[in-house]
Amino acid sequence: MNAPKKLPADVAEELATTAQKLVQAGKGILAADESTQTIKKRFDNIKLENTIENRASYRDLLFGTKGLGKFISGAILFEETLFQKNEAGVPMVNLLHNENIIPGIKVDKGLVNIPCTDEEKSTQGLDGLAERCKEYYKAGARFAKWRTVLVIDTAKGKPTDLSNHETAWGLARYASICQQNRLVPIVEPEILADGPHSIEVCAVVTQKVLSCVFKALQENGVLLEGALLKPNMVTAGYECTAKTTTQDVGFLTVRTLRRTVPPALPGVVFLSGGQSEEEASVNLNSINALGPHPWALTFSYGRALQASVLNTWQGKKENVAKAREVLLQRAEANSLATYGKYKGGAGGENAGASLYEKKYVY
């Protein structure tokens, strides 16, 4: 039997230690790795020009928030941000270190169509990844993220077996390359909420996808103790007319994880997937209320941590302090949800606004 080569002991130990820190009790990950194109959409909503200076100001707002490290363990950055400084000349990475927040980096290069499929997607970025990982590590990154996308369409048989295999194998190759270069890989197989499918269909598809992913991780020799999973919660499609409860989401999500995710994995950091800020917190709470679990179940939210922050900031310096208060409020709500102790209501009515975008591109 030809097994993959083992990682050196010191590398394995470093990866496992970092992974555990990222999912430490009461903390989650801030996903701030929007591409330049995606952050333009965010800025357009508040009528702010998408310049490098404005992007730096916004990231400075987020990472310079005093007390953020109480609720946030890591922050995923876009490549520009990893090497960026704020207006005062302080590197963004240093702002994170000041709060004991671990910097991470988005390493995928976006989506392309898989040939011979009905526009199912493959993720680019494996070419040159090892060299980039070395540079990112030197710049202070200690973990990475790679997003894949699948769509449910029962009438068309999506996701196909080919899509499942492509997703799983690409994630496993990425994870292996990251670990060889001392970066903890966050493995993100996102099943989009697009469509009218039921929550039960989402559960079946998610179970199959995660089974494929962990099979591929094993075949590629990925150290599970030094990796994290970033999946969708099990929810109904956005256009589904059947009503579901947060308890349904909690039960089916936990059941799916128990059927597929080995306990060697330190933690699962859920994506918000277009849920409102409040939904993302309440559903995370329902998931953790069903504990104890063999892994930490926490969050890696982008829109569900930032939407109200952006709306409060509006690109104006005089709004920075208030926007930071909003960020802390939302981060604390999700921290409470990791214990199953969130009672709801943080952020008021605005936090209930849908953040769904069809065919979401990050």
UniProtKB/Swiss-Prot annotation:
One of its GO terms (cellular component) is cytoplasm. Dihydroxyacetone phosphate binds at D33, K145, K230, S272, G273, G302, R303. May be an effective malaria vaccine as determined by epitope response in sera. Antibodies against FBPA inhibit its catalytic activity. The record marks Y362 as: Necessary for preference for fructose 1,6-bisphosphate over fructose 1-phosphate. GO terms for biological process: fructose 1,6-bisphosphate metabolic process; glycolytic process; protein homotetramerization. D-glyceraldehyde 3-phosphate binds at S35, T38, K106, E188. The active site is at E188 (proton acceptor), K230 (schiff-base intermediate with dihydroxyacetone phosphate). It is a peripheral membrane protein. Beta-D-fructose 1,6-bisphosphate binds at R42, S272, G273, G274, S300, R303. InterPro entries: Aldolase_I_AS, Aldolase_TIM, FBA_I. It catalyses: beta-D-fructose 1,6-bisphosphate = D-glyceraldehyde 3-phosphate + dihydroxyacetone phosphate. It comes from the Eukaryota. Its EC number is 4.1.2.13. Its main location: cytoplasm. Gene3D superfamilies: Aldolase class I (3.20.20.70). Pathway: Carbohydrate degradation; glycolysis; D-glyceraldehyde 3-phosphate and glycerone phosphate from D-glucose: step 4/4. Homotetramer. Interacts with TRAP (via cytoplasmic domain); the interaction prevents substrate binding and thereby inhibits aldolase activity. Interacts with MTRAP (via cytoplasmic domain); MTRAP phosphorylation may increase the binding to FBPA. Interact with RH1 (via cytoplasmic domain). Interacts with RH2b (via cytoplasmic domain). Interacts with RH4 (via cytoplasmic domain). Interacts with AMA1 (via cytoplasmic domain); the interaction is weak, however it may be increased upon AMA1 phosphorylation. Interacts with EBA140 (via cytoplasmic domain); the interaction is weak. This is Fructose-bisphosphate aldolase. It comes from Plasmodium falciparum (isolate K1 / Thailand). The gene is FBPA.
